[in-house]
Amino acid sequence: MGHLVIRILHLVVLVMPMTATLVVGICATAAAQQVVSKLDPVGFEVKVDVVWQRDKEDWCWIHPRAAVIPNADEPSNPKVLMTLGREVMGESDFFSGTYVMQTADHGKLWAGPDLFPQLDWWKESDEALGGVIDVTPGWHPQTGKVLAMGIRVRYDLNRENPDRFSQLQDKRPRLAAYAVYDPKSDHWKKPRGSSYGAASRWLAGCRAWRGWQILELPEEEKYFRNAVGSTQWVVKPDGDLLVPVAHSKPGGLWSVTVMQFKFDGEEMRYAGHGNELRVPAPRGLIEPSLIEFQGRYYLTLRNPVTGYVTSSDDGLHFGPIKPWKFDDGAELGNSKTQQHWLAHARGLFLVYTRRGANNDHVVRHRAPLFIAQVDPAQLCVARRTERILIPNHGAPMGNFGATQITENESWVTVSELMWPTYLAKARKQGAAGRTFVARVMWAEPNR
């Protein structure tokens, strides 16, 4: 059942340039040439809110990501739905079902987190427990529905140690999955003297969610494993979806292909795909994120050694991938975690973590969280625009989301991961199991 309404804590206002201002940037191209880039910086301020805090040693919140539900009567104040999960302390990638939080007043008050049965674990057999992890929700305007996409995994019920959990690696261990939310069905009566009623809210949410479905892909060996975890995707003007899918054959490296899907408000149907992107490096390419900016499509990709980037005219067929770099030719230093996009009408932004920020003590350098403007022509990060979005408090913040909320504001959502191996040190540095909303407040409207 639901928790009480959460009142927001305003944590910090921060706009923090990391380097001296430069007149122009220099981008290193694939041919190792340098090209002068005249980038017009887009102004913004940042305010960080704490929407939830839980600092205990059994589990912590992870993967918070938001979706906007437009408000026709008041466009500047849409409803926002946020999905998130629990991770069991000390267990790698053992997550709960998907919880949901909601706000109808621009984040001043949040209802939830609620766990609806349609989004919870399910028992597949006597041997396996099914669930969906790494969820990203998004609005589909043509049908008035929210799509939530993630990865179906299977947990071993017959493990040797009943106190530890592990993912099963047989029978197609990872498959892309999605659920559908209908905001028109999600309504409840507010009890007298209360802003929200947990019981009636939970029942309304049960009506509104259509549970997890497996995303049907072509029956080819290279799609034996497939995933849309922690992935940004694009809705085209005609309602078709462009979804970057990570996939591999049994035991193979992961590749990424952007696929096109039809969505009728209830089911997604495969409609085609573009070229396959590969890298001969450990694990391959995973956790891809796609965005459209000024008529062109940009794709960022995770790899254990470095992040990669590429672009496309049609959103399906992409050019050769290249490592992320600063505009002075130096490596960006992002690896072993995801990157995501924000777009303003005048500028494209990358949100990421990286090495070299006095953060060697943080697991996989997953704090602080940075934001910087991207040169879309040269596919590099303008170093002079890099700012700290959420400071380093000692705990990793690598599993995050990035979403446009209104024409004046975009949000980056993330939780502090409080693992036992570094919990004491992280607490000394200020970590407290918080779930943050970093508000990127644009200096001019994003139209």
Regions found by a protein language model. Name each.
Residues 28-31:
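Sec/Tat signal peptide C-region and signal peptidase I cleavage site
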Residues 63-65, 134-136, 230-232, 287-289, ...:
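Conserved beta-strand position repeated once per blade in WD40 beta-propeller domains
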Residues 9-26:
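Bacterial N-terminal signal peptides
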